[in-house]
């Protein structure tokens, strides 16, 4: 299920555009996640008071967390599938502390694709979308495998 060198290049090309505004992209991804899948908000105690999209847009904490999420994802993507060292602590915290189900990682992956399509349509055509989908699926599968090792049924 690995990606070719060309596919990784497509992923990293668009990711360079994300890195130019990690906070803005991250905020948009989290708002999209919470609007599309409101049940995911239950996993974020510090965001439970954010009832409207306006509240979410005004939250510096949400913007910061979005930046954190996409920074971590970018570090993993740049490893081009050789990300075991980066996945381990992420899986550990998301399984044991945050209890984030793999399904929620699928949800956020879908939102990431949508945000990239909207913000970078010229650089995120069908080939790049397919490559990013594969990269995010690889990430989720590896997280799910670590979850299983940790005994988390998420």
Swiss-Prot record:
Q: Mind telling me which PROSITE patterns this protein's record contains?
A: GLOBIN (PS01033)
A GO biological process held by the record: removal of superoxide radicals
Annotated Globin domain ranges read 2-148
Q: What is its EC number?
A: 1.7.-.-, 1.11.1.-
Cite the InterPro entries for this sequence.
Answer: Globin (IPR000971), Globin-like_sf (IPR009050), Myoglobin (IPR002335)
Which major enzyme category is it? oxidoreductase
Family annotation (Pfam families): Globin (PF00042)
Q: Which GO terms describe its molecular function?
A: heme binding; metal ion binding; nitrite reductase activity; oxygen binding; oxygen carrier activity; peroxidase activity
Residue list for modification Phosphothreonine: 68, 75
Q: Which residues are listed for nitrite binding in this entry?
A: 65
What does the UniProt entry say about where the protein is found? Answer: Cytoplasm, Sarcoplasm
> Does the record's keyword annotation contain Manganese?
no
Q: Where does O2 bind?
A: 65
Q: Which residues carry this modification: Phosphoserine?
A: 4, 121
Q: Name one GO cellular component term.
A: sarcoplasm
User: What family is reported?
Assistant: Belongs to the globin family.
Q: What is known about what this protein does?
A: Monomeric heme protein which primary function is to store oxygen and facilitate its diffusion within muscle tissues. Reversibly binds oxygen through a pentacoordinated heme iron and enables its timely and efficient release as needed during periods of heightened demand. Depending on the oxidative conditions of tissues and cells, and in addition to its ability to bind oxygen, it also has a nitrite reductase activity whereby it regulates the production of bioactive nitric oxide.
Name used for this protein in its record: Myoglobin
């Amino acid at each position: 299920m690995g990606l070719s060198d060309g596919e990784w290049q497509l992923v990293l090309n668009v990711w360079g555009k994300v890195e130019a505004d990690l906070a803005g992209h991250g905020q948009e991804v989290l708002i999209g996640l919470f609007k599309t899948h409101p049940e995911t908000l239950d996993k974020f105690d510090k965001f439970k008071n954010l009832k409207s999209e306006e509240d979410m847009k005004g939250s510096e904490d949400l913007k910061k967390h979005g930046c954190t999420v996409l920074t971590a994802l970018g570090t993993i993507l740049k490893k081009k599938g050789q990300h075991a060292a980066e996945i381990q602590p992420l899986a550990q915290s998301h399984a044991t502390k945050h209890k984030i189900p793999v399904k929620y990682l699928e949800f956020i992956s879908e939102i990431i694709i949508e945000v990239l399509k909207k913000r970078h349509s010229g650089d995120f055509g069908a080939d790049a979308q397919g490559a990013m989908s594969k990269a995010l699926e690889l990430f989720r599968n590896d997280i799910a495998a670590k979850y299983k090792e940790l005994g988390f049924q998420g």
